[in-house]
């Protein structure tokens, strides 16, 4: 296996390029990262979000996969049977865009990119089970996805319905609400339009309550992510209120043909306590009343059309200017029939939330307040803040949205808003309008069904057939997979499948008559909603193997960006529940632990021509200030903000270049060392050089001491300096273990720098120290290599071999610390005088309260204070603090 270093000369620099490749080949040859099913050890499944094969990996990938690899290698060393797979999230628009621009087939483009990126990932020395690799565009994978679709369809979890959708006019496809950001398509950046199309939906809303309740169990997820999902699911408890409608023509004694069909409207409200502050009703532009009125009113029809130019999402509606169209209808107040409230059609009311109609109380809601100010409507406060007098309460520039006491509200006056809610509900449930109760308590969810239809080629075909006689029918399971045709053209935007007659033409599986295939493909978020389950048995004939999922799921540790907090993570949680319902799995949640890592960021540079890349400049210190100059002509370049690495701003660093210059271990060490893993890491050349110097320093110390240490058996010291070294080593091992368990990689790295500093002077004179110290040094070095191995695996292997070992570091068990050696013999307590810290005292670990008191009273700064004032008492909190009260 070539695990010796005799050809190195003493003092020769470590050559990462040659060494790293060697160890990667040895790991591959021995298949040490291939996971064995049915192994008796405790299982641990660690997974990083798999990448989209865009062409090259970036530093964000490196950090993400380095984190996952540290966890995988550490858990393997701790005796777990680790599953750490890799695959490719390979369907999607960029491949079609490349086909349009470069005239290369999406399949060719995708698989070529996968080959490049696989090579890049392998250079990083990741302990991945490559035998389980798949791409979601593999026919084998999307065949199983089509099987899942049919299973869901048979269970009633798939619906086909006409829906208003977000249409991306650049990508010529439908976007889910979650894929619209600030009214624009998440990929194209185009302003989204609203269209009505017949779409396929997964009925995720059936699981709203369960998805919400499940969040309580996910205590190993960031609180922020759980909150985001909670808000997205959006459970609210409110009241359905039926309002009688009248035409303003009635009040004027005119004709009542305005809207004879509508004598009432139902509003949903989470704040029925504010009913006496209502000054308008607002209906969605899609409400049946709005549609009916628009048939007779051209101005209203034009208003509705104009509203449809914006996005359909809540976010889009919240940011758009509030607009309303006054109708010839008024609503009769449920508790006072003499009060008539104007009815508007408004652009900020969603038809698919609640009932598509709301009542506005401007005094206590920002949106209603803005609307009332714009249309000069009354703003009547009905909730008074506590400890405030009515005459002092003025709503000048903003509504009051806090708690308080009801005012200006008839029989509700003096109640709290919560009590008023219940009172209004009770009265309206007993009050009758047109033979039915006028109010009803209800629970609503914001979560909508997941529209999965996409009008594009490079996605998983939806296995349905359209027959003029039989309607829409599923493709028989035996006829799967529905394979994408290769002979498609990309000479125009839109879906090539819709133009491919031969592929579409098929016999109806029920009546045998000519029929057409569904040309929509599935949203690519479907592909990533179950891949983690497929990894447990990637070649099973069924989508998942129940025994394998029972063994491996949920994923113990999932790692990825917080940008997926809602979309991907919510869809994956839905998929697990759906797969459980159809009998494929026995667990509810896909991911037990979730870690969201920060980004890799870099300075930006620009000159008159635009953005400049780091490779094109040199940085020099001038008068104590950093200045940037172009390498070509030495012209000055402006140093801009530190931002996320992006091609558009040219502030990217190619991992290949850095690995070629410094080696993978240096890159891995740096991206994990500079800041806590949940925070952004700032990429700097000096930081990388510092990491590389550490690599060389480790190697130098091992190379210089190897001749002596290779023949020494490791053993803890029993006395003197050897004992002190062993104590430091065992404490360090204990602390680093704790850091790795908590994902505190940067803390572990800081300790390892410190530990090398402790060992260095002893290693420098290793030939001259006593045998007990040699044995303690050898044990300390073995511990050190075990601790750096998850982060810098190649260097650890090389050093391990240099010390005469023929085993692989990657297969070694994690060392065990001696509890007796990690006990602290003393500890330091902060000492306060009258609650202010004045100094510290160090006491023996076994010191009693009396001994601590004596030590504190003997301190000079305490003595000085006692001269001026006598002591009243001394408060001692063992292991925490001492407070002397004068």
Curated annotation (Swiss-Prot):
Motif ('KMSKS' region): 644-648
BP terms from Gene Ontology: leucyl-tRNA aminoacylation
Record keyword Zinc present: no
Gene3D superfamilies reported for this sequence: 2.20.28.290, 3.10.20.590, HUPs, Isoleucyl-tRNA Synthetase, Domain 1, Valyl/Leucyl/Isoleucyl-tRNA synthetase, editing domain
UniProt protein name: Leucine--tRNA ligase
Binding residues for ATP: 647
CDD domains per the UniProt record, alphabetical: Anticodon_Ia_Leu_BEm, LeuRS_core
GO MF: aminoacyl-tRNA deacylase activity; ATP binding; leucine-tRNA ligase activity
Top-rank taxon, per record: Bacteria
GO cellular component terms attached to this protein's record: cytosol
Protein localization: Cytoplasm
Gene designation: leuS
HAMAP family according to UniProt: Leu_tRNA_synth_B
Keyword annotations: Aminoacyl-tRNA synthetase, ATP-binding, Cytoplasm, Ligase, Nucleotide-binding, Protein biosynthesis
Protein family per UniProt: Belongs to the class-I aminoacyl-tRNA synthetase family.
Matching PANTHER family: LEUCINE--TRNA LIGASE, MITOCHONDRIAL, LEUCYL-TRNA SYNTHETASE
Enzyme Commission number(s): 6.1.1.4
Stored InterPro entries: aa-tRNA-synth_I_CS, aa-tRNA-synth_Ia, Leu-tRNA-ligase, Leu_tRNA-synth_edit, M/V/L/I-tRNA-synth_anticd-bd, Methionyl/Leucyl_tRNA_Synth, Rossmann-like_a/b/a_fold, tRNAsynth_Ia_anticodon-bd
Catalytic reaction(s) noted: tRNA(Leu) + L-leucine + ATP = L-leucyl-tRNA(Leu) + AMP + diphosphate
Top EC group: ligase
Organism: Bartonella tribocorum (strain CIP 105476 / IBS 506)
Motif extent ('HIGH' region): 51-61
